[in-house]
């Protein structure tokens, strides 16, 4: 299945708009290039709607969060939704601070995300409206492991169904759940 997904990306060579963590921006660009896409980075509110319009998808990462980037995230997300483009959210640090948590919750309320990926604490914060995260790391008491795997799978399936999105919990074990796919998306 992964080969088919990569073949599809290479065939379409989409431009992907990224509003991402400044620390990883180069890595994100290189991964997109390696997969056959073409990255462009912009979080400037006056720029994002135009940039999003020429792209095939949007990647939003809360790693480097500030008020200007939030405005850019919302504008780009709304424009992507208008265009029917897939939108990915990485809610870095949701649950670690009120500012990050409120931002992540506002984003998932206002924007339809195709993919939501984060550690278990971040995803639970999105699902329940509050949570605790140790910086950008999951709370170790919540980590997905062999003992709680079935419970974690039930949780992620329920959240994926509620958000009509592919949901990925990252960690030692990486459960993925999807219930609805649009014509242009591949699991």
Language-model features and meaning:
Residues 32, 77-80, 160:
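A generic structural signal for well-ordered alpha-helical segments
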Residues 80, 85-109, 115:
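Glycine/small-residue-rich loop that forms an oxyanion/phosphate-binding "nest" at active or ligand-binding sites
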Residues 36-79:
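Active-site cofactor/substrate anionic-group-binding motifs, chiefly glycine-
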Residues 36, 82-84, 164:
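Glycine-centered short loops/turns at secondary-structure junctions
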Residues 100-178:
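Conserved phosphate/ATP/ADP-binding segment of small-molecule kinases
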Residues 180-187:
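Single conserved hydrophobic/aromatic residue that forms the stacking wall/gate
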Residues 1-41:
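Glycine-rich phosphate/adenosyl-contacting loop at the front of the ribokinase-like
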């Amino acid at each position: 299945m992964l080969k088919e997904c990569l073949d599809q990306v290479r065939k379409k060579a989409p431009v992907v708009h990224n509003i991402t963590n400044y620390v990883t921006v180069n890595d994100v660009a290189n991964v997109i290039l390696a997969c056959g896409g073409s990255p462009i980075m912009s979080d400037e509110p006056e720029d994002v709607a135009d940039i999003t319009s020429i792209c095939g998808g949007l990647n939003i990462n809360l790693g480097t969060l500030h008020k200007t980037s939030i405005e850019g995230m919302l504008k780009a997300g709304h424009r992507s939704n208008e265009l029917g483009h897939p939108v990915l959210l990485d809610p870095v640090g949701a649950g670690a601070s009120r500012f990050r948590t409120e931002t992540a919750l506002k984003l998932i309320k206002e924007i339809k995300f195709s993919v939501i990926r984060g550690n278990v604490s971040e995803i639970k914060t999105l699902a329940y409206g509050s949570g605790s995260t140790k910086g950008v790391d999951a709370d170790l008491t919540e980590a997905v492991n062999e003992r709680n795997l079935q419970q974690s799978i039930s949780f992620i399936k329920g959240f994926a169904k509620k958000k009509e999105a592919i949901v990925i919990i990252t960690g030692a074990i990486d459960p993925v759940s999807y219930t609805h796919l649009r014509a242009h998306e591949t699991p």
